Each structure stands twice: as structure tokens, then as C-alpha cells.
Amino acid sequence: MSEHVYTAGAMPRRYAAAGNSSRQPSAASALALAGLCVVGLALTWIVAALVPAAHVRDAVALHDFTLLSRPHVDALANFLLDLLDPALFTLWAVFLIALALVRGRPRVGLAVACVMGLAPLTAETLKPLLAYPHAQVGYTYVAPASWPSGHATAAVALVLSAVLVAPMWLRPAVAALGGVFAVAVGCSLLILAWHMPSDVLGGYLVASLWMALAVAGLRAADRREASRRSESARISRGARRRSARRDPIAPPVPR
């Protein structure tokens, strides 16, 4: 009876663990997503910079967003963008890294440091290398070295890092709120005419690329650790069996 009770109690926990594991993306799927981000980045720049119709449409979309400008709208937009200034962005990164360490997840903390450090750096490096003159509609003007947007990159890097650090049960809420924040930052950049729509999309893709690479690294590390633990357990079991064969338990002495 006790054996059946033990088995029934253990099964839900085992199945729950298996379910959580199956919901985690594998290293291969994360790398595939990173590849899609690279393709998306290339297509976004090629279409925006080299296709005349898209070149003009980009400018028209920017002009349409600037028509939403109002004093209170501009104030809110500036407030959101101020949250991503370098000093504050660094504080967000330090907070998330510290939270990951407190939760006993140093690898996640390292992944957050890489994403929040390398994603904005990538955006700022690409700007002068891929600069091209933008079409202009009305009085809105954006300088050539604007693709991809550093603020859009920072916003998505922050959101994805927060999702990665958050407990599993809290991730849907963090992702939903973070998605609203990232979209609001993108709209703010357009309303204030800081960037073209293609710049914002490029920034989103840069941050997503680095997070996909970080998740691939985490999953590969988890798999190696699980393999090492399994091998260690197998060796330990073998050692116990050999020890038992060498030192059999003596039979009880009859009285």
C-alpha cells in the first residue's frame, strides 16, 4: 500500500517537472530564432534603404505619427524615453542582474549582462556603418545614421531581460506589460520624429537577436550540466555496486 501511495504522490511532481522542461525553448530553436532575426534585420535595411517605394512609405508613416504630437503626448513620450537614458538603463541592468543572483541563477544574470550590454552597443555600431539618407515628408527630418534605433533596442532588451529573470508564473504578466512598454517607446520615437519606422523595427530585431543567442547559450549550458550530473550519478551507482560486491554484509550470528 505504501509503495502505491508513494508512486501516486511522486507522479504529479515528475510530470510537472517534465512539463516545465518541455515548455523551455531548446538551444536549436533559439538559434533558429536568432537566424530569423538576422534575416529580418537584413531585409528591413535593404527594403528601407534600397527600395524607392518603401523609402518613401517609411517617411510617410513617420509624418503620420508626428501628427499625433500634442503637448501632453510629447511630455509622456519624453518621459518614456528618459527611462532608457544610459544611466537609468545601467541601473535597470544592475537591478535585473542582482535579482537573478538573489534567485540563485548566475547564468541568467550573465545572460542579462550580455544582452543589455551588447544589444545597444550593436545598434550604435551599425548606425554609422549603414547610414543612408531618408526621404522627407513635410518638415520632419531624421539624420542618415539612425538605423537601428538605440532606444528601441534598449526597450526590448530591457523587457526580454525582465521576462528571463522573472519566475515562470510571473512571466506572462511581465511579458504583457513589457510589450506595451516596448510599443509605447517605439510610438514615442516616431511621434517625436527621433527615428524612422524602419529604425524602430531594426532596434526590436537587434535586441531579439541577442536574447535568442543568450537563451541558446543558457539551454546548451543546462544540457551539459544535466549530462554531467547523469554521468556522475551513473559512476556513483557503479562504485556503490562494486563496493557492495567487495564487502558483502556478513550474515547474522545465530544465538
Identify the residue ranges that each predicted region occupies.
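Hydrophobic alpha-helical transmembrane segments of integral membrane proteins
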Residues: R107-Y139
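Alpha-helical transmembrane segments of multi-pass membrane proteins, especially transporters
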Residues: H63, A111-M116, V174-L177, G203-Y204
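N-terminal transmembrane-helix/juxtamembrane module of multi-pass inner/ER membrane proteins
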Residues: M1-L88, W92, K127-T140
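Interfacial segments of alpha-helical transmembrane regions
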Residues: A28-G35, A93-A119
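Structural signal for the C-terminal ends of transmembrane alpha-helices
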Residues: Y6-T7, M11-Y15, A98-P106, A162-W169, ...
